[in-house]
């Protein structure tokens, strides 16, 4: 099921169902070692999916949830490797979009929901984008209009004493530091892997050329002559 959030459209599956997760990875063409984010309706469900909730995590959750923030936390025992990519951490988000909230509240559990696009492609921000990307490959698309934010959620590693910004997004680094009451720490080689942080990601279908202005004028003139 594809559904709208305030950031981008998500492609959702039961985060506790290995078969549903396998189908999710297959439809997206996503590597199975690339973690997905678990979406919840309410912070009261957090203890089912994460453990050792740090003071930093509590402060950020109070400030930005529901909203476009994903927190990386230590995973609870029930959370499988298919969600975390084999890591000891899990990404959790509580979206603010009314349709997403209604869906999550009705479902009553965690929904694993990466962006509703094929792996490596640009994220969908409308229901039409989802249909264009997947055709009939998605069972149901909930149309909530265009996403308000239009980029994916900010991801913060909140497993330690200081927040670590793993993926920039709508929430700025300064806002994170102010809410956490601590300066951002730099990611290290041991930081958790996070969705949307590979070297090649969000690639448009249209080719992009980078060139000097003189060469650009020559190319434009050539294309004009060719019609």
Where are the regions a protein language model picked out?
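Active-site-adjacent structural elements in enzyme catalytic cores
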Residues: 1-227
